[in-house]
UniProtKB/Swiss-Prot annotation:
Residues 17-22 are annotated as: Involved in allosteric activation by GTP. It catalyses: UMP + ATP = UDP + ADP. It comes from Sulfurimonas denitrificans (strain ATCC 33889 / DSM 1251) (Thiomicrospira denitrificans (strain ATCC 33889 / DSM 1251)). Homohexamer. Allosterically activated by GTP. Inhibited by UTP. Pfam families: AA_kinase (PF00696). Belongs to the UMP kinase family. One of its GO terms (cellular component) is cytosol. One of its GO terms (biological process) is 'de novo' CTP biosynthetic process. This is Uridylate kinase. It is an enzyme of class 2 (transferase). The keyword Nucleotide-binding applies.
């Protein structure tokens, strides 16, 4: 699968580690090494990171003091903080990285320009897409799906703490059943929390497969993309 183009979505919470907040540099280093293994296999990589380890727009707006729009913009800025951290970690690992933001902040990153992003990918650079879609009321899952479609990614990978999609939370229910493969319709209609409905609908409309996999299993991303080993993931298509 040489020259495959993928977009990997990491949750912000994943960066927090055991502390549950902030950024754990050991996890950053682990992720950057996983990304490096993809680049060395001639896989073009785009990245979107959430901001939940710093702030969530919905949570910030819960008591009505902060408006939802402002809360969401705060969340977008949190993804930029995570993006800078990821850029540093990937560069420390020896990768060439560019970050593009949906909200202009030229002192920190390039503005999101689709053609430029694609050119970076073609040159073997990792591209981090930050600040969500630039609009409130849209999740970073939706931003990841949107960017994946825009850059022509063959697949979007949602890197999580579990090895796929289950019919219920495997951390709470010992009898949870793993769903190896499911349709977009199942993901939408059965209320299975793969991504939010907007993300899944966008993926469905553009025939973009969604892979859900365990980000903490070393070598898992490369094994899935290069060897087609689907044992440690689920696919929505």
């Amino acid at each position: 699968m040489a020259n495959k183009r993928v977009l990997v979505k990491f949750s912000g919470e994943a960066l927090a580690g055991e502390a549950g907040y902030g950024i754990d540099t050991k996890i950053l280093n682990f992720i950057s090494q996983e990304i490096k293994s993809l680049v060395e296999a001639n896989i073009e990589v785009g990245i979107v990171i959430g901001g939940g380890n710093i702030i969530r727009g919905v949570t910030a707006a819960q008591d009505g003091i902060i408006k939802r729009t402002s809360g969401d913009y705060m969340g977008m800025l949190a993804t930029v903080i995570n993006g800078i951290a990821m850029q540093e970690a990937c560069e420390h690992a020896g990768l060439q990285v560019r970050m593009q933001t949906a909200i202009k902040m030229e002192q920190i990153a390039e503005p999101y320009i689709n053609r430029r992003a694609v050119r970076h990918l073609e040159k073997g650079r990792v591209v981090i897409f930050a600040a969500g879609t630039g609009n409130p009321f849209f999740t970073t899952d939706t931003a990841a799906t949107l960017r994946a479609v825009e850059i022509g990614a063959e697949v979007i990978i949602k890197a999580t703490k579990v090895d796929g999609v289950y019919d219920k939370d495997p951390n709470k229910f010992s009898d949870a059943i793993k769903l190896q493969e499911l349709s977009y319709e199942q993901a939408l209609n059965d209320n299975i929390k793969v991504m939010d409905d907007t993300s899944i609908a966008l993926a469905k409309d553009n025939s973009l497969p969604i892979l859900v996999c365990d980000m903490f299993k070393k070598g898992n991303l490369l094994d899935i993309l290069q060897n087609g080993n689907m044992k440690n993931c689920s696919i929505v298509k």
